[in-house]
């Protein structure tokens, strides 16, 4: 297309100032004058088209009217003063066969303006015509006309000055390869490169022309539409096979993911959701993006499916329980109906109501008059089946000897409390003597070793306390009171003993304290009824006032106390 466009520009430029100077008029004139004189052959030069690169704009030094064919051709000396003896490439003088018959006379072409700026000139003599080669023979390539390394076209004028057409590009870039191939094909089509490439067989020439024409119309380097990579013509087949292999691997990878998800034991809900997701995928999405999205959302989607499967499992379990309950109720109703039918049949056979005697008189039971008997009255009848555990003996005494060992404390070990009134004290002593059956009281705790300064009862959870709580003393000051105030040395020793005791308590940490005396345990006891732990004296004084635990008010006997070791 560029060749025709260049030729069109040359026809309408200053080379042909006369509008009649066109190839069509030239043919008409030459055919009209062919019958006059056919002795002188003539070659008709075609309009000169400058080969121009496809992608690059180059500088053309002869686009104005000052340059004529005479300034570019060599060895033309027939016209004195206008053309000098110059050599020029004969490939520029290619003629079409229909325009140059062998017996054509070129003398009438003088009507097409033979001035110094015309594009068509007659040859002066026979030597000039014979000095040129035929336009249909392979042309010889001049020196510096075509370089294999750089596709540049050079011409020289009469002064020996060379003109370079084309731009030099780096040979390593794709653009240079494209320009090289395109320029080479353009020059070959226009006849500028006409050595062994032009001197081939007709079949090779036809194939080469097809390839060159395709290259002229599609001169851009191919680009992969998938990965947008610039490719060379030799890499097209290999790259296409690589893309096809990647495309074939995508369905297999997707099927493997689905097979992993559809492992044995997968619930139906998971299979259904996977199929819905597979159907809902966009058909226009690319395989790469779909695979990336599946991998990106696989974790969250698996979590969603697991939660939904667990929820459906719970719902199915509830439904199964409800069905079992309904079946059990149906069986019970069936058995009840069978019993009712049996009773009705029996009553119908007997044709009498239930009778009983009361005070020597026979009476009819009123419930038998109701339809359905006692069950029809709305009361619930209990089954006659007895529980097999109902015959077990009930242990009222609570013999825990085998489990907890023999009792360690008795009623004689209890420390009785003294009331404010003498009458209450006498009653307590009488009751205690009756319980002991005249036995002597225990001497486990003597008043001198008692932690309590008086016989007042400690406070319990019921709020019962003595009015002299301010006078109560704990084990912290009991040792000091035992010592007489007359001896200063004894007091000093007692203080040192107290300090050592406090140091031991600090070293132990005193993590365990009695909740009654608020001191560390002297002899801890626990009850097998409530398992609360208190000091021995605290337990015995509390049980002397009431048979209840001082912490939780659980009924506790002296025989329930057991010694423990912390």
Swiss-Prot record:
Annotated segments matching region Disordered: 277-297
Tissue-level expression: Ubiquitously expressed. Abundant in brain and spinal cord, particularly in the cerebellum and cerebral cortex. In fetal tissues expressed in the cerebellum, spinal cord and cortex.
Pathway annotation from the record: Protein modification; protein ubiquitination
Catalytic activities: S-ubiquitinyl-[E2 ubiquitin-conjugating enzyme]-L-cysteine + [acceptor protein]-L-lysine = [E2 ubiquitin-conjugating enzyme]-L-cysteine + N(6)-ubiquitinyl-[acceptor protein]-L-lysine
EC number(s) given by UniProt: 2.3.2.27
Cross-link for Glycyl lysine isopeptide (Lys-Gly) (interchain with G-Cter in SUMO2), residue positions: 277
Start and end residues, zinc fingers (RING-type): 514-553
Main location: cytoplasm
PTM annotation: Auto-ubiquitinated; leads to proteasomal degradation.
Any GO MF annotation of the entry: ubiquitin-protein transferase activity
Entry keyword set: Cardiomyopathy, Coiled coil, Cytoplasm, Deafness, Disease variant, Isopeptide bond, Leukodystrophy, Metal-binding, Nucleus, Phosphoprotein, Transferase, Ubl conjugation, Ubl conjugation pathway, Zinc, Zinc-finger
InterPro entries: E3_ubiq-ligase_RNF220-like (IPR052443), RNF220_mid (IPR031824), RNF220_RING (IPR040178), Znf_RING (IPR001841), Znf_RING/FYVE/PHD (IPR013083)
Chain's role: E3 ubiquitin-protein ligase that promotes the ubiquitination and proteasomal degradation of SIN3B. Independently of its E3 ligase activity, acts as a CTNNB1 stabilizer through USP7-mediated deubiquitination of CTNNB1 promoting Wnt signaling. Plays a critical role in the regulation of nuclear lamina.
Subunit comment: Interacts with SIN3B. Interacts with CTNNB1 (via Armadillo repeats 2-8). Interacts with USP7 (via MATH domain).
Protein name: E3 ubiquitin-protein ligase RNF220
Origin species: Homo sapiens
Gene: RNF220
């Amino acid at each position: 297309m560029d060749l025709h466009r260049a030729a069109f520009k040359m026809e309408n430029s200053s080379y042909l100032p006369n509008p009649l100077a066109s190839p069509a008029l030239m043919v008409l004139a030459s055919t009209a004058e062919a019958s006059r004189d056919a002795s002188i052959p003539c070659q008709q030069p075609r309009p000169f088209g400058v080969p121009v690169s496809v992608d690059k704009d180059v500088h053309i030094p002869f686009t104005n009217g000052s340059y004529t064919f005479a300034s570019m051709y060599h060895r033309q000396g027939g016209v004195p003063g206008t053309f000098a003896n110059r050599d020029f490439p004969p490939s520029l003088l290619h003629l079409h066969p229909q325009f140059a018959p062998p017996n054509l006379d070129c003398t009438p072409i003088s009507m097409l303006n033979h001035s110094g700026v015309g594009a068509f000139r007659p040859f002066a003599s026979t030597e000039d015509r014979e000095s040129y080669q035929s336009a249909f023979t392979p042309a010889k390539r001049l020196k510096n006309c075509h370089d294999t390394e750089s596709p540049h076209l050079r011409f020289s004028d009469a002064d020996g000055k060379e003109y370079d057409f084309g731009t030099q590009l780096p040979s390593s870039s794709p653009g240079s390869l494209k320009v090289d191939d395109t320029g080479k094909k353009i020059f070959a089509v226009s006849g500028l490169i006409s050595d062994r490439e032009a001197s081939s067989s007709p079949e090779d020439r036809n194939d080469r022309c097809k390839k060159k024409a395709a290259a002229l119309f599609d001169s851009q380097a191919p680009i992969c539409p998938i990965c947008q990579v610039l490719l060379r013509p030799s890499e097209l087949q290999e790259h296409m096979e690589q893309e096809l292999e990647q495309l074939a691997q995508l369905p297999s990878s997707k099927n493997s993911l689905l097979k992993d998800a559809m492992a044995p034991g997968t619930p139906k809900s998971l299979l259904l959701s996977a199929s819905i997701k597979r159907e809902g995928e966009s058909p226009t999405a690319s395989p790469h993006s779909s695979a990336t999205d599946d991998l990106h959302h696989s974790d969250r989607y698996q979590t969603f499916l697991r939660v939904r499967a667990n929820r459906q499992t719970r719902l199915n379990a509830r439904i199964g329980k409800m069905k079992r309950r309904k079946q059990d109720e149906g069986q019970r109703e069936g058995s009840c109906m069978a019993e009712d039918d049996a009773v009705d049949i029996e009553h119908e056979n007997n044709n009498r109501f239930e009778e009983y005697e009361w005070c020597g008189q026979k009476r009819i039971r009123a419930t038998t008059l109701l339809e359905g008997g006692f069950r029809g009255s709305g009361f619930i009848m209990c089954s006659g089946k007895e529980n097999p555990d109902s015959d077990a003996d009930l242990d009222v005494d609570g013999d825990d000897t085998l489990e907890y060992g023999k009792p360690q404390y008795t009623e004689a070990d209890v420390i009785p409390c003294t009331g404010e009134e003498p009458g209450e004290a006498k009653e307590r002593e009488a009751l205690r003597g009756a319980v002991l059956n005249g036995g002597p009281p225990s001497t486990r705790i003597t008043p001198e070793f008692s932690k309590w300064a008086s016989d007042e009862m400690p406070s319990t959870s019921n709020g019962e306390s003595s009015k002299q709580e301010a006078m109560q003393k704990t084990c912290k000051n009991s040792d000091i009171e035992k010592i007489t105030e007359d001896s200063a040395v004894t007091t000093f020793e007692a203080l040192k003993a107290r300090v050592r005791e406090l140091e031991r308590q600090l070293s132990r940490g005193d993590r365990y304290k009695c909740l009654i005396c608020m001191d560390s345990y002297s002899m801890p006891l626990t009850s097998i009824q409530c398992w609360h732990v208190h000091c021995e004296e605290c337990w015995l004084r509390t049980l002397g006032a009431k048979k209840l635990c001082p912490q939780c008010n659980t009924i506790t006997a002296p025989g329930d106390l057991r010694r423990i070791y912390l």
